[in-house]
Amino acid sequence: LPNSTIEGYTRVRGGWNEGEAYTVYFYAETDTPAESFGTWKGNTLMPNINEQFDSGEKTGAYLSYSTSENQKINVRVGISYISCGKAKENLKQITTWDFNKVHTQAVSEWNNILDKIEVAGNEEDKIKLYTALYHCYLQPVDKTGENPKWISTEPNFDDFYAIWDTFRATHPLFTLLTPSVQSNMIRSLIDIYRNEGYMPDARSGNDNGRVQG
């Protein structure tokens, strides 16, 4: 790897659904080559060692720089549930090192959703409404193309928490504001049923946490 990149993975388990452990891969790059690098395990630094593996003990890698006053070093990170190579590919979604441009694009994409509702009222009530709407669209999460369990051309959504509650208002809201998103969520649920035999009421970490029946 060039001296401006770090890649690796971690195994994750636990959480409310008590699902199987899953792997999260990452690929990180900086806009400035590092002067030195190394890895660490526990409290021990290992300069110039470019690989490190462990199970249970905290492990990582680092890049070191000699910076001038007020110099900024930008970092961008791609993640994947498939591989480090896929994480690197996902990183291509960010085409610039300009943080302000990335921020502006993110704001624009969120406004495409938040602008679908216009209300009159005082500022406090508007903050409550748009904060709630923002929270509605944080999950389920669209992970299409990132299913580590089976190959499918169907949409892939994760982090359903939990449909026995969200069917009352959240999913009807999706149907009104973003019907294509709601349709893709339903297709994802059907695809989960086809491959795992159960329709989840709640799902996280690519695993069913709760099912009916």
Model-derived features with residue positions:
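Aromatic-rich carbohydrate-recognition surfaces in CAZymes
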Residues: Y161-T166, T170-G213
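Beta-sandwich/jelly-roll carbohydrate-recognition scaffolds of carbohydrate-active enzymes
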Residues: L1-F160, D191
